[in-house]
């Protein structure tokens, strides 16, 4: 009887028999949910294609612009650049010189301003070309030696005296002012301008001085009043159109020592820019 109990007891473990659980259906569990049976207890490992590593995500435009470095311009020299050393104060003058001159002038070097053709041409044009408007305007400004004369045109070799000071009218762009201090021992005028810059053509000889005053100009005491009065010419002017405002009369008698010093009556050098033949009178022709 005991053997029958052992065979029928479900928890009895026989040394020659395995433990048997109640058989269950594969799609059934305790909750009643059905699952698809898995083919293997663990999922298979993923394999990466050998060409997958070359595929990269393209960067965004914002990150591309920030990461890109600025490209510098490429300078290609057709000629070897020349290095010129100069001072900062001379930089602008050097730039104007290099940009305003031709290549042939640059090869000549710096030079001075007088050797440049443009400068010499402008100087010659200023000195040699006369103006179209040639007018003589005379204005008496008070008495004494205040005598104003405005002249425009090429030089005529005459001068004006203001209190023993001579102003030469030789050109519209050049003038020489001389006083008794810069006149040499032999009556030569020491001019500060070069001779070529103020050279003037030779002038015709002046007219002879007016005749002396008649004896009636002397009073009983022997004083010559004619020396202090203007002497009018006895001949008519060469051009009647010039006889206006003040006429063709001299300003005063130049024999009076009040106007000239003794060394001013001496001969002037021909190398002077004034071109005077003499200072015996002051007259317009």
Curated annotation (Swiss-Prot):
Residues 11-23 have a biased composition (Basic residues). Its main location: nucleus. Keywords: Nucleus, Plant defense. Residues 1-68, 195-218 are annotated as: Disordered. Residues 201-216 have a biased composition (Pro residues). A motif (VQ) lies at residues 91-100. It is found in: Nucleus. One of its GO terms (cellular component) is nucleus. It holds the Pfam family VQ. GO terms for biological process: defense response; regulation of pollen tube growth. Residues 1-10 have a biased composition (Basic and acidic residues). May function as negative regulator of plant defense. Plants over-expressing VQ20 display enhanced disease symptoms after infection of either the necrotrophic fungal pathogen B.cinerea or the bacterial pathogen P.syringae. This is VQ motif-containing protein 20. The lineage of its organism: Eukaryota, Viridiplantae, Streptophyta, Embryophyta, Tracheophyta. The gene is VQ20.
